[in-house]
């Protein structure tokens, strides 16, 4: 063992190394097992399967559709999100915390709730339908567009892309707004004195493009990633189309069974390998952009910058507030729909106000899991995910920061990418890993009551690490040097040099963990097939998917969705309280 | 760095060295006999039922069973009948449930071939002969039934725009272009049942030069819509059903696959009003029976037997049409008269005659042919 080898480990405690290995293993193991299992069942290697991906029914259509809708979704998100983030970061705003929370809300809204909200908005009786924009049955303008262009289901496509933009706008805010808010005003002043800074185009070209470019690209990469792997929104809003993710979800249940539907196992192997490689490329790109992005942050004090530019003009106020109203529309529709019932008889259609949906949701009249049990399950999985993911995420982030500070940039980069792997696999792939992988070889896990928390942990860990790394990097090492001179124990030393500075980011990570786990759909959708662990998001989907001969089925589903939304919002409010606390104490 | 990568590689590939050995499924021997497997979990007094979203299993119904017998019940829910079979196959080496409820006769034989069920200990009486026709062995007990058939929208098939088909070939005519929707037999139980019926239908028609898959090909070429499940077909695409009043409805198809009693159910909830009716062409309908079976490798066997007995009791099974929207399997079962439920329910004159054994043997081939025909 070389001295260099020892030095690389010297700065990182052994327990943190174990956490790093555990996290990487947690991400790699299920999917590797799943791939090997599918290999064993089909007798075809992942590479051979990959070559045959174009022969799998629906695979290429799904690939083309995923690519197209993700590209359009990303483009639109940037077009709308960039000016939004710029205005939001540059000027003073009333109730900025509330506005920021509302802008962030869609990202943590469970996709299944968002999907039913959009459905209610675009169906007959919905706001969009009433103003003549029929995206569902594609009559009127949308029907004309379909007839003129020969484009099949443009309405469904528009609805899906709109939902993706709605979902991902907060990413632009999350990544771009802080850069705008903290950009050093001296740069702008100096540029204004130069010939190239005299025109708007010149300022964009010489200041805003290099400053905002990396952050925008990071947000765009993640938007593309989330749109490409969209599952619940596609299932509900574009029923005639499949993304690769929804196709995998559709056929994944039959994969990995020896002697049964081997061709399905082959299709899953081929599509899963193809998608994983694609996402891996996306992940490497995102990592590269993010590293560039992190060098631009923390340039100037945000409050001073905002005071300098003053309140936003009326035009910007209208734009930002308008977007806020649009963002809330699908969620408001969910709540309203829970109180409306449509009935039909020989006399025609009528629509009445009712509390029956809420009564049934509460009493659990349907054969599904009772509401309180599903809510308890959801909260249990969320808290288990939090209890495991937070310390693990901290340990990994701490290791990565230490490695970077000691000059091991490359090693930190590789480990960082490996820890982000679950993000590249997407929820359905993780679920597939659980079903076709671990459960096939370790069936004892069937009786593990918190099984759905395992894929949740895998999926939230990358987010926790992403939040913790910059927070730890910001801590001045001088505190450590000073504390080492004082008489205090190990715990006290850790708290005064690190723990106290991480309370707020840890609270934010915790809230994200809880909200993400509460709304997670894809992985649970697959895991739930092998156990009795229905979460609230699954319950919403189950009830909404039931035959609606009985007109109260839909209001019941909407009532359940409202409960899920409110609980998620409560969790999110904790997040915003933490931000507020940080602003007051400025640690 | 290279050293680290090597260690990581070893760490993650070493445990997989034994994984490439294929796990062989447990199947019946040459005489069709199956060994009874060891219990997959430790007994905890809770009866675990593997089922799909069966409406009849309300909290009230389960509570009554618990009060009557003392057995606690926990439901493990999957998507549909096919999901039950997949779950049983995936967990064959360590079953976690005791009782499977909802396998239908298009899946049952596969479950029997893979030794997924074991004999019950009940003395069954009072079951209708029709319900026992597809299977009357000891490994599964019918608990509800219904006839899968085509449904059409009477307001569109009015004799002017579209006329009532007298042969399945009529649906391949230009007038029907883009007007039909079918749930896929790959992922839908009614879709699978209807595809099986078409095999029998075209084997017994007058034309010996074409088979079912020629018809499916012609249907695909005539713009038939294919969906993954019954719900998407009936609720989103079919214009004659309740979907017309549900968010997300498209209503682009005048004909779909459902049950012969679906118009009756529509009327039951629509105050004796429906614009949907069924098409009962001979051999184009499929008598679907759903079964309860004790899982081979289950733990709470006594409780499982007790639940089957409860499921077949007069108080539960007689109410299947209202509670589960399916027909009871008891002798002299009738559809309720309420709101025209019985009036709008048609009885097929001749269902497709196709055995469970043949379905199990040939289904994968049919599905493959169906995929080729409809691509």
Q: Model features per residue range: what roles?
A:
Chain B
Residues 117-126, 140-141, 169-172, 260, ...:
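Short beta-strand->loop
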Residues 290-354:
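Mature extracytoplasmic/periplasmic domains
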Residues 350-375:
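Conserved C-terminal helix/tail region of periplasmic/extracytoplasmic solute-binding proteins
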Residues 105-116, 133-165, 185, 191-201, ...:
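Periplasmic solute-binding protein
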Residues 26-110, 235:
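Early extracytoplasmic/lumenal segment of secretory-pathway proteins
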Residues 197-279:
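Ligand-binding pocket segment of bilobal, Venus flytrap-like solute-binding proteins
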Residues 38, 95-100, 118-155, 169, ...:
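A structural signal for short loop-to-beta-strand junctions that line the ligand-binding cleft
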Residues 1-31:
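Secretory targeting signatures
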